[in-house]
Amino acid sequence: ELDNGMTLAVKYEADNDEDDAGAFLDSHSITLSSDEMGSLTFAGHGGASNMDNMDDKTPNAYEESWDGVAEADEETIPNGITGNNSFFYTAPSMGGATFSVAYVPQGETATPNGAYMDFGVVFKPEAVDGLEVGVAFGETEETAGTTVDEQAIYAKYTMGSITAGMN
């Protein structure tokens, strides 16, 4: 932590799981943050988007509700685009609302036809402990000239060790 309250975090995932032969480091990112400005993350690999963060917030024992489904692929699942060399900004919370934006530049494997950007809002009202509501929206263009609007909306409530929610 710096004297002005800013923090700098560097993360590496050392698991030898990168597609490149012999690559030891997989996901990696650097984040600059402070209470006043929020946080800005640059992900060289393994970045996230708002749609990816909010696509399945309902409690479940498996990572995603569609895991293990044979026909579930990127074209049918509304989870936005993640990619290398991406940016993710999260503003500081204002009255329980947190705004964020994600950007993946054109030319990355995940964005062959143009840059990708999505937006998200998460609201955790201070008057209702345990309630969380979120919405994210973005537009993808996996096929040139064909855009697809995607949205993810969720609500969940946690009381003690019990969580109920819906997407």
Regions found by a protein language model. Give the residues of each.
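Outer-membrane beta-barrel proteins
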Residues: E1-N167
